[in-house]
Amino acid sequence: ADTIVAVELDTYPNTDIGDPNYQHIGINIKSIRSKATTRWNVQDGKVGTAHISYNSVAKRLSAIVSYPGGSSATVSYDVDLNNILPEWVRVGLSASTGLYKETNTILSWSFTSKLKTNSTADAQSLHFTFNQFSQNPKDLILQGDASTDSDGNLQLTRVSNGSPQSNSVGRALYYAPVHVWDKSAVVASFDATFTFLIKSTDSDIADGIAWFIANTDSSIPHGSGGRLLGLFPDAN
């Protein structure tokens, strides 16, 4: 199975798999059952911003999600990623819909990692920024229903004539692997930011967007749609 660390923006509470009974952001370590959550209210049709950071000295993964003029939701969890992730990983975005649906539109995405190694004076770093997405992106690995549209947006799940479709799952991963730790036990610090737009034609919306780090050959697990956000094969 894939090894996944994720931050979920969960728009539909699935209390049967440990979700709180409200919309929330959560930090997930190798399971859809979040290690830490905080209440979050999605604003239908508005552009929000998510910022994720990992401090390798404090060993703390944090996320903050906000809308312009609104309050922010913040969640953090203390975790030593070099005990969990392989040395090389890919970073990605994932989303799903189930019976209920929403658009899972990404307008921009950036990432910076810095791995300071003991063996050399210099730091290994990776940085990318998408302020828009090209029609046939060579620097993204698109999986499932993910696509880029003529407006320069990344649609993680299926949209037809501007309307979200049910039972859809899609992911986008940056093509270049990231070196997150090395054998001298030095772990990379990183920052990621993405802007997103979730909108729905229904009163009920589902299921959410996740930012994730995974082994480099990660693919969408069979049966991981809906509440599993395209990340995990089951709810364990």
Swiss-Prot record:
Pfam family membership, one: Lectin_legB
Residues bound to Ca(2+): 10, 12, 14, 19, 207
Signal peptide: none
Key words of the record: Calcium, Lectin, Manganese, Mannose-binding, Metal-binding, Toxin
Positions that bind Mn(2+): 8, 10, 19, 24, 34
Keyword Heme among UniProt keywords: no
Classification via PROSITE patterns: LECTIN_LEGUME_ALPHA, LECTIN_LEGUME_BETA
Recorded GO MF terms: carbohydrate binding; D-mannose binding; metal ion binding; toxin activity
Tissues and organs where the protein is expressed, per its UniProt entry: Seed.
Protein residues bound to a carbohydrate: 12, 99-100, 227
InterPro entries given in the database record: ConA-like_dom_sf (IPR013320), Lectin_LegA_CS (IPR000985), Lectin_legB_Mn/Ca_BS (IPR019825), Legume_lectin_dom (IPR001220), Leguminous_Lectin (IPR050258)
Post-translational modification: The beta and gamma chains are produced by partial proteolytic processing of the lectin alpha chain by an asparaginyl endopeptidase. Mixture of 60% alpha lectin and 40% of its beta and gamma proteolytic fragments.
SUPFAM superfamilies for the chain: Concanavalin A-like lectins/glucanases (SSF49899)
Gene3D superfamilies: 2.60.120.200
Anything else known: Binds one manganese (or another transition metal) ion and one calcium ion. The metal ions are essential for the saccharide-binding and cell-agglutinating activities.
Role noted for this protein: D-mannose/D-glucose-binding lectin. Has anti-inflammatory activity in rats. Induces histamine release in mast cells from rat. Induces lymphocyte proliferation and IFNG production.
Family per similarity comment: Belongs to the leguminous lectin family.
Complex formation: Equilibrium between homodimer and homotetramer. Oligomerization is pH-dependent with homotetramers forming at pH 6.5 and above.
The protein's name: Lectin alpha chain
Origin species: Cratylia argentea
Lineage per the UniProt record: Eukaryota, Viridiplantae, Streptophyta, Embryophyta, Tracheophyta
